[in-house]
Amino acid sequence: DVTIAPYSLLSVKGGKAEAVTPLHGVQWDRVVLDEAHEIRNKSSKLSKSVCRIQAGIRWIVTGTPVFNSMDDFVTLCRFLGIDKSLVQGMTKKIKDIYILRRTKDDLAKINERLRLPPCYFENVELDMYPDERQMYEFVFKEAQDTIKDTFKAATSLNYKNMVILECLLRARQCMIWPQMYLDGIAKKNETKPEQWVGRSHKMETLFEMIGGHPQEKTLIFCQFVGEMNYIQSQLECPTFRIDGSVSKEDRCTQLTNFKRAPPGSVFIIQIKSGGQGLNIQEATRVYIMAPAWNPATELQAIGRSHRTGQTRPVYV
């Protein structure tokens, strides 16, 4: 017998970390964790709950065993029953003994039917328009001054790190679409946001590239809801979207509708919400609007289209 269950069954909202679920009451012969990086935070209720499952054999499957640091890998090893003391200082040996790595090319060598069409990558470098550059230089100068003032003050290290991360966030928002920076500052100060009346070279180029391939379906992976809203408002073709606010039911509906939609349709996806766990081989054009925190996250997102079942070349 095989039981397939979502992680949500083990993550009881509002419950205690040691809460008992139906999966904890069985002595399993084997437990396989797909997308195992979901348990990488050892302090989370989900991670603690998953590690309490009773099983004779434990497997983990993931394309991103390390997100932020080797602590992520240590947590995965904990689920496998490998003591932390053995992992530290013996990472290479642990990898050689316990890890089986298979790339898409490896699978094609095993079975020719698993060979995928090529995936072509293009890094599009753009110069900012003068008004964009002026805005970004202002944001950069503000960030410098804020960080200097923070480090001069007698504040905790955690607070300093928070300030740095916020400055980086504002700079990223400005580079993607300046209006997001203005909206973010206004929300923080509880004021009415100024309106960006300038142009966005990145957005204009995106719309031009999409328009150049009207017979192909497109995936656009974004970081922020603000940019998703803007992109969707500017496109005249059929659009679909998944972000963090979309329920599981609506997520399935959006995916099904995109698959049935005519050529030229666009699926706008927040990368942290839909960058994994989706099969979207209908799309052959993939755009990543901004670098992800972890480059492996981008590869996961691209894999929504370039995966088993894809019959045409994919352009990223």
Regions found by a protein language model. Give the residues of each.
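SF2 helicase/translocase ATPase core recognition
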Residues: 53-87, 108-143, 266-316
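Conserved Helicase C-terminal RecA-like lobe
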Residues: 112-132, 154-278
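A short beta-strand-to-loop transition that corresponds to the Sensor-1 phosphate-sensing loop
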Residues: 6-9, 35, 61-65, 103, ...
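SF2 helicase catalytic motif II
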Residues: 22-60
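Conserved catalytic network of the ASCE P-loop NTPase/AAA+ motor domain
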Residues: 23-25, 51-56, 67, 211-213, ...
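Inter-lobe coupling linker of SF2 helicases/translocases
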Residues: 4-5, 9, 24, 45-55, ...
